[in-house]
Amino acid sequence: MGSNLSPQLCLMPFILGLLSGGVTTTPWPLAQPQESCSLEGVEIKGGSFRLLQEGQALEYVCPSGFYPYPVQTRTCRSTGSWSTLKTQVQKTVRKAECRAIHCPRPHDFENGEYWPRSPYYNVSDEISFHCYDGYTLRGSANRTCQVNGRWSGQTAICDNGAGYCSNPGIPIGTRKVGSQYRLEDSVTYHCSRGLTLRGSQRRTCQEGGSWSGTEPSCQDSFMYDTPQEVAEAFLSSLTETIEGVDAEDGHGPGEQQKRKIVLDPSGSMNIYLVLDGSDSIGASNFTGAKKCLVNLIEKVASYGVKPRYGLVTYATHPKIWVKVSDPDSSNADWVTKQLNEINYEDHKLKSGTNTKKALQAVYSMMSWPDDIPPEGWNRTRHVIILMTDGLHNMGGDPITVIDEIRDLLYIGKDRKNPREDYLDVYVFGVGPLVNQVNINALASKKDNEQHVFKVKDMENLEDVFYQMIDESQSLSLCGMVWEHRKGTDYHKQPWQAKISVIRPSKGHESCMGAVVSEYFVLTAAHCFTVDDKEHSIKVSVGGEKRDLEIEVVLFHPNYNINGKKAAGIPEFYDYDVALIKLKNKLKYGQTIRPICLPCTEGTTRALRLPPTTTCQQQKEELLPAQDIKALFVSEEEKKLTRKEVYIKNGDKKGSCERDAQYAPGYDKVKDISEVVTPRFLCTGGVSPYADPNTCRGDSGGPLIVHKRSRFIQVGVISWGVVDVCKNQKRQKQVPAHARDFHINLFQVLPWLKEKLQDEDLGFL
């Protein structure tokens, strides 16, 4: 009955820009009706194959550490036969086989030696580099052959500093022509036959001592970027030091500063999302990419920034779904709604691949009416994410649009102030059919940065963007979770605390709580008695086995479970809240993070409300007078699961509260308001849906509203009408009057504000 409410998060906020370069890309032939191909004889020795594009292509799959030889993919030709198995030197092979992956040897290494020397290197082999006297080593002195056929670390370079520019090096597997590094000197790189060059083939020594373009590498068809490689390279590119920052930014030409992408809420950035919806992409990849973009928008918004969005899908023709000039283009919820409504079938009737027209659609959004630039145009960063396989088959070379864009934005015209940091593109190719030449041509090329990535499948793309999220600056943000499919229970509920109170000769009490700050856990007061000692209270967070030391338990002063015994009410749970103060400060991480509390600045940001938002306005947003979807976290079979419930805060509120009379000991209460005070929220019952109920061990845990990808606690689980978890098993069939009651945090805010005043929560 538990519900995983948060969508899979694929993407993090990152800067994406338009394309740069001038390389002619390779078109993909238009699809023609063709015969189906027989699968007889297509097997691969030591591996398997899977069909792609409804049987019109196949991919060979080998175990880890092996690659398909001589090709990774084959296509079904119009003659009804599969494409021939040919090696890199065009020799025909009769049968495909899985061969062990090797890493290439250095073709050349200048001004030094490497050891050991070998024609090739096996996975896990190491190689060491040493420089001659008078030369200094840059990069990695020791490198290891990895399972994907690439070397670990960075290119080793021996340099004596004699050139105007430093030696650009020879990446392993490439060949370099040119050994002079004076101003405006150039070097060129080449790959062996059958390998594809990624990065810049030609690099020129520029003013300031930097090289144009980006470091090249030689790629085999079976090579993919691992999620970790992509994440590290991407994050590195965002913070790379650059020169020639726009003087209007307060930095003179040649002055260095960190390349930081600033998502300014005032709207100094336009993010264009361009998604290939052609036949070669396929419906499943299109849907997966769309989900990733939805989560990108959500993630950017969760950090409190509001760039303007443009949204384009394309096949034979582009479709502009959102323009940056639309009034709501900076409204993340509205843009997400438009994206969710896009279907792969929207391009079904004309399903070619016209990347050039898609970029022209972006250009049209960037250009100005009557060619008159608006004020501040030169301070706006234009950004894009392009998800494609690079197989354009109509419309011409998309690179030709780039010159127009660069001219429009005055990019690269002033050598002292090239404004290159206002124009970037990161191209993500997904799957085995990606055209590496084309996606490389479409990506920006900047020194010490990587902008083009090839990942194995959509699942790997998810991994990429999870790993891109730099948690270090956001761990203290409340109500955020790591919703990765590989995440543990505490990645998905990082605020959840387990509480145990040991009472000699009386057994123990189990409860839940929520981390609300680095020193405090919020829970229910009834979990403790006045006789409990701090050393008998055990608290654990983040799934850790160690218990945290307790300094003190703070009860709400109005809590008194025996307060109405004289009136025949055996237990009275009004103000059933307590704060556990820890002796030592919690160290936030992916599995330990605070939940949001009402009427705090953090919740205002989480809900994307104006800074002037009042506590009452937060209450109206979180607890409107209606049925409110919420959740609590329960432990079942040692696993934390989310249970979706509805807070009855509208016309069902009265009937929900009246069912309290069915609770043991309350059957003789004449006025139910004697036990259900205004401090309670009510869940449970069968309308509008059959709500799951809490169990005894859930007491003290948070009642949560999940909104805009953030989790805000609105209540503390207190008591229930029916024990639905007898014999440690949750009953599936429960009576309609099975209700649960929770302390409404809006009703105990003065106490929370007083006790948490030193926790920097910014109470309103």
From Swiss-Prot:
Pfam families: Sushi, Trypsin, VWA. It is found in: Secreted. Disulfide bonds join C37-C76, C62-C98, C103-C145, C131-C158, C165-C205, C191-C218, C478-C596, C511-C527, C599-C615, C656-C682, C695-C725. The record marks R259, K260 as: Cleavage. The keyword Acetylation does not apply. SMART domains: CCP, Tryp_SPc, VWA. GO terms for cellular component: extracellular region. Residues 1-25 form the signal peptide. Mg(2+) binds at S278, S280, T353. The keyword Ribonucleoprotein does not apply. This is Complement factor B. It comes from Pan troglodytes. The lineage of its organism: Eukaryota, Metazoa, Chordata, Craniata, Vertebrata.
